Amino acid sequence: MKKLIASLSFLFIWNCANAQDPVDYVDPFIGTTNFGTCNPGAVCPNGLMSVVPFNVMGSEDNTYDKDSRWWSTPYDYTNSYFTGLSHVNLSGVGCPEMGSLLLMPTAGELNVDYHHYGSKYEKETASPGYYSLQLTKYNIKVEATATLRTGLTRFTFPKGKSHILMNLGGRADQ
């Protein structure tokens, strides 16, 4: 009987040690393609702020581009060209048609045309309340987080000239 109790106690303790929180099962990339209009950005449940990657303009390599057709979401998982972080988009309803204020970090010489300052990216990760990626063109790490009433971004730049551009929503030819 003592061996049975010891074995059950061991299994209970081992199971508790390996337990995951429900947040560990969240996949922020669900619904980010095939017209799902969701985004993997830093969003806090019931929060007033969402910091969202914007990858739907500026490159012919993108599957979906907001300037070539109607497209109501700031992000599509199949796209690969990043032009900034939006701080005003809702997940699940799209909404860049109402305007998107984008922050975009760049390095080197200043260029304000999003067709040229945008960048491909890698190392994209997302979890509830956090989003990050690495801009391959500039070697800049982009991170975003959100709380109930605040969105924060952090850009880690290489040495040399660097810029943070703010796109107020116009097209490059305007």
Residue ranges, per PLM feature:
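Accessory carbohydrate-recognition regions in carbohydrate-active enzymes
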Residues: Q20-Q174
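Bacterial Sec-dependent N-terminal signal peptides
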Residues: M1-Q20
